[in-house]
Amino acid sequence: MPMDPHPTAFGAFKPLNHVVISFPTAGAMGQALKRIHDAQFEDAQVFQYTPAQMQSQAEYDVAHATSMADLGQDLNLVREQLHLAKLGHSFLVVYAPKASQVETLTQIAMEFGASRAQKYGLLLIEELIPLNESTTQRPESPESGLDPVTR
């Protein structure tokens, strides 16, 4: 079940103190979800999104976000979530305010082949799993989107 209410900053999805994990298949997400529950995360801490649910949410956010959402990478990350949802990726959003919880979720994400995993903090959104072998980065902006290294 998706988060209700839908947490945003300036109209863009921003689940503060949560880890957002995307999986290429619903099966991988289901296996990760079982492991997350085995790691003592409560049902109230875990939210599931089908590709259609994330696509609908991301399309709404892109259409309704304010220009302030473009100051950081929040809106670019929503666009990336939309892209992944259109490719059929499923998502888990897990409340994880403690560093030990984030470490556990990072290991689970890697074990089950997550495509992305990010920790949403107040001022920083942290990439939790390696995304690309390349070390050449380029600036990110609302016009150019996310650095290809982080895709």
Listing of model-derived features with the role each one plays in the protein:
Residues M1-R151:
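Positively charged, small/polar-rich N-terminal and surface patches that mediate targeting and assembly
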